[in-house]
């Protein structure tokens, strides 16, 4: 893939100030406007976004992350397309960036089995291709995850994490102070998960929770060997600390960024979307895109979380 370098230039105005980062009605935002994994790349410069298993890992609208990436590329003059990868497909290793969404227990098990049997995503990760994983997608990428019935499933081993149930489900607005270089603004999303994800030594947190729960605390810490990793680096708080300021959110390891934030998270956080695009394009920066509706959405969601 040879990317166009649009890292220099003035602010790009979105057509009509489209709301939610291009997720409004229109041909460019249609979730049906995708291509099959075995289709040919239209040109060498076309950016291919791999939408991984939306048939089972698309419960919470996380498919929208691929739409955001495509639209932000198109606004900057790049040709981009979404490659829809289902359970009926071999997973290609040729996409320039991948997104994986959330799902329930049965869907997670199907996803883990298929991605293990068809390891194109693993090959892409080994080459440093950027991947965004949401909620259950994050759990599948780990060493193992426990379902609500207590059964343990093996993950892909791409992230040094384990996931087991919390005492109660985490539902609500989530605001996170990012700890990843390149992110300077608070991250906002909506969490809806039963799992508590614990980081091992090779994984780092995406950020520190300001409002909400984040990665959570296992109901049975003894089932998770690294339970102390539920606190942010430098905190003295114990695993079960009540202060949300001591909690961490998400996982960063290699080229993978994972989070419990739905929304879709990239629609709410354009800086996050552009960080992923810079990695996919191999550039240091991109010209800003002015979407006033997104800034309004961010203000509203962050204010809601603080109430």
Where are the predicted features?
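Pocket-forming structural segment of enzyme catalytic cores
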Residues: 149-250
């Amino acid at each position: 893939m040879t990317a166009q370098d649009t890292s220099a230039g003035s602010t790009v105005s979105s057509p009509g100030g489209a709301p939610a980062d291009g997720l409004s009605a229109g041909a460019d935002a249609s979730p049906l406007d995708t291509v099959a994994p075995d289709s040919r790349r239209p040109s060498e410069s076309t950016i291919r976004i791999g939408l991984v298993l939306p048939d089972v890992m698309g419960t919470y609208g996380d498919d929208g992350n691929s739409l955001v990436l495509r639209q932000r590329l198109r606004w900057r003059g790049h040709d981009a397309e979404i490659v829809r990868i289902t359970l009926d497909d071999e997973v290609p290793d040729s996409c320039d960036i991948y997104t994986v969404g959330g799902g329930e227990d049965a869907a997670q098990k199907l996803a883990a089995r298929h991605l293990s049997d068809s390891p194109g995503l693993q090959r892409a990760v080994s080459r440093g291709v950027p991947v965004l994983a949401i909620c259950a997608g994050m759990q599948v990428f780990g060493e193992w995850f426990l379902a609500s019935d207590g059964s343990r499933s093996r993950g892909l081993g791409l992230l040094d994490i384990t996931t087991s149930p919390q005492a109660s489900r985490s539902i609500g607005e989530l605001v996170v102070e990012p700890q990843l270089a390149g992110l300077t603004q608070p991250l906002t999303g909506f969490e809806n998960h039963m799992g508590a994800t614990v980081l091992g030594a090779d994984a780092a947190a995406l950020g520190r929770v300001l409002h909400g729960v984040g990665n959570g605390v296992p109901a049975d810490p003894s089932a998770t060997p690294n339970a102390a990793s539920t606190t942010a680096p430098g905190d003295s708080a114990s695993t079960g600390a009540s202060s949300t300021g001591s909690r961490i959110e998400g996982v960063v390891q290699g080229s993978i960024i994972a989070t419990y934030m739905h929304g879709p998270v990239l629609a709410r956080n354009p800086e996050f979307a552009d960080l992923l695009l810079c990695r996919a394009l191999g550039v240091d920066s991109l010209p800003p895109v002015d979407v006033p509706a997104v800034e309004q959405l961010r203000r509203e969601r962050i204010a809601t979380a603080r109430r």
